[in-house]
Amino acid sequence: MKHLLIIFISLFSFTVISCSSSSDDGSKSTTTETNISVGSDGYVASAQLSAFDYPEWTVGAFINSSMRNNLLKSVYSYFKDEFDFIFLLQNETASDLGYHGMYIGVSNDVMGISEDKEGFDATKYTGSNGKLKAVIHFPKKTGVQWGPSLHELMHHWGNHSLSTGNLAAYSFDQNVLLPEDELKQINAGSHWGISSVNGQLGGFDLSTLQELGGNWYTADPFGTFANGGNSIPYGNFELYLMGLIPPDNVTDVVLFSGLKATAKEFLDDDKWYAEGKTTVSVEDVINKLGSRVPDYTASQ
C-alpha cells in the first residue's frame, strides 16, 4: 500500500497601513506575490498573503476558482509536484463562513466507489501535473487538529456510492423552527444520513438500533452528516471505500426510506419512522459500481 502525501499550508497576513490620496478609487489591484516559507520542523508551510488578498479569504475566496488556483500555483512555484492533498489552514480562531471545512476535488481515478466510470483530472488548472487529488480549506486553525480534517479527507472517497436507486442513503432536512414541525426527507448527498455506516460522514451505530414497532426506530444519538470531529474513527464501509480493507471485511449497511418524524421526535427523542428498511451488502455495492480499482493491496 502506498502512502498519501499531504502538505499543510497556514494562511496569514501582516496588517499594512498606508496613506493614499482621496482620488484613489480602489480600482487598482494590490495583489502581490505570495511568500511561502517552511517551518523548522518541516511539517507545515506558511503562506503570507497580501493585505489585499487575505481579507478575501476570510469571506469566501476558497470557492473562487481563480483565487484558489492562483494560490495553488504559488504553492507549486515553491514545491515539487509530490502532494496528493493540500490543506489550507486559515490562521484564525473564529470565522463567519458557513462551514468548518470544505473539500474541492481536483482529480480522482479510483473506480468502484461511484457511478463514474472514467474519473476526472483538473490538475492543470492548479499547477499540478496529474498528482493533486484535492484541496481542503479550514477557516479556523483548529480544523486539522480537532476536525473536520478527517471528515473532509473522507469526501475524496465518499459518499458517492450509497446515493441512487435502492442503494440511496436518506436524511432529514433539519431546517425547522418548532418541535412539532415535520422534517422533510432528503437525499443524504455526500454523507451517510440515517444509515448504519457510523463514520466520519455520519450514520448510527448498528449495535444500538432498536425497532419500536409500527415502523418506528431508534438508535444512540448520531449525526446524519458528521459524528464529532477527529475523535471519531472511520467507519467500516468508509475504510473499504478508502482502499484500506478488503471486501470480505465489510459489514452490511442498513438504510431507510420513506422517512418521517417531527423535529422533537428525531432531534430530541432520537427516533424516526421509515416505510422501508434495506440491508445493503458489499456485494450489492460491487454489483452496482464494480470492484474497487485499485483494490486494498494496491491502493494509496
Where on the chain are the PLM-derived regions?
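Positively charged n-region of N-terminal signal peptides that target proteins for export
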Residues: 1-4
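Bacterial Sec-dependent N-terminal signal peptides
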Residues: 14-36
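Zn2+-dependent metallopeptidase catalytic core
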Residues: 31-149, 153, 271-300
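Surface-exposed patches in mature extracellular/periplasmic domains of secreted proteins
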Residues: 83-89, 160, 252-258
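Catalytic Zn2+-binding segment of zinc metalloproteases
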Residues: 150-170
